[in-house]
């Protein structure tokens, strides 16, 4: 977006029905053989005090890393839980957090987590989508294809599970048909994938033809790297959080530092 590093790759459809036209100007980028992807887990901003910490600690440290990267292109993505649950429907508060995120020195992509949703609504992430855009999207950088997916499924006001809807599986299938299997495939979602989740078999089957597949996730407030046998081996990176132990200290639940 203009004046912000938050990536604006979409246009909102008007509420009224009928035909609508949106024009996009595409600019060809040079092929980046090397780049740095900075992953931020769970900022989970819950107050103005924690927003200041996120700005002065996390964002400042990220910008220092970018500054030290020289000519290496940098990108950032948040794995969701950008806000605490009591703020997910506060438009002004979301705008404040978005402004802080937009102060980074490189493009910033965003996905949603369970705390970014209003489980009591039919469309549980209306405010988050109004602020940041689509919840499922993809993009290419260099030789990698990145796919961002919402994998939080609420069943009522409090209970949620992990997985993907039939519509998401269909969308992912169509998306991957356009991608060479020689590309590195990176799937970014909020919750790590475990032994069981909705549409597990259909999801794994779509990834088997790719030579190298990674999953980036957050959610657990600790760091974990595991190999998933799907039967193809897929490397899952679970990232520690910006908020650590919910902004109560400067460490995550497993003792690793707050950060990215």
What residue spans do the PLM features occupy?
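Short acidic, glycine-rich surface-loop motifs adjacent to enzyme active sites
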Residues: 176-195
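Divalent metal-coordination and catalytic microenvironments
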Residues: 42, 76, 81, 113, ...
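The substrate-binding groove and active-site-proximal loops of carbohydrate-active enzymes
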Residues: 43-50, 79-88, 151-165, 191-194
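Divalent metal-dependent phosphoesterase catalytic cores across multiple superfamilies
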Residues: 3-111, 117-135, 202
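Extended active-site neighborhood of metal-dependent phosphoesterases/phosphodiesterases
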Residues: 87-179, 199-214, 225-260
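Catalytic metal-binding/acid-base residues of hydrolase active sites
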Residues: 44, 82-83, 115-116, 192-193, ...
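Active-site-proximal beta-strand elements of phosphoester/diester hydrolases
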Residues: 34-47, 143-153, 186-188, 236-240
């Amino acid at each position: 977006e203009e004046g912000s590093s938050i990536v604006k790759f979409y246009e909102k459809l008007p509420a009224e029905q009928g035909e609508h036209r949106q024009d996009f100007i595409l600019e060809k980028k040079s092929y980046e053989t090397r780049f740095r992807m900075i992953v931020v887990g769970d900022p989970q901003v819950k107050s103005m005090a924690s927003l200041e910490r996120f700005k002065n600690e996390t964002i400042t440290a990220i910008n220092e890393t970018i500054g030290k990267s020289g000519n290496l292109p940098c990108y950032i993505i948040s794995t969701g839980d950008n806000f605490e649950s009591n703020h997910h429907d506060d438009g002004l508060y979301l705008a404040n957090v978005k402004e802080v995120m937009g102060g980074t020195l490189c493009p910033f992509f965003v996905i949603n987590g369970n705390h970014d949703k209003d489980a009591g609504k039919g469309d549980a992430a209306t405010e988050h989508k109004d602020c940041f855009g689509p919840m499922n999207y993809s993009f290419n950088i260099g030789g990698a294809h990145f796919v961002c997916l919402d994998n939080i499924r609420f069943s009522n006001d409090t209970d949620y599970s992990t997985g993907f809807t039939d519509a998401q599986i269909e969308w992912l299938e169509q998306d991957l048909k356009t991608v060479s299997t020689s590309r590195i495939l990176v799937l970014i979602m909020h919750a790590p994938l475990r032994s069981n989740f909705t549409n597990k078999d259909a999801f794994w089957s779509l990834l088997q033809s790719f030579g190298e597949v990674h999953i980036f996730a957050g959610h657990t407030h600790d760091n974990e790297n595991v190999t998933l046998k799907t039967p193809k081996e897929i490397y899952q990176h679970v990232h520690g959080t910006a908020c650590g132990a919910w902004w109560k200290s400067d460490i995550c639940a497993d003792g690793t530092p707050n950060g990215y």
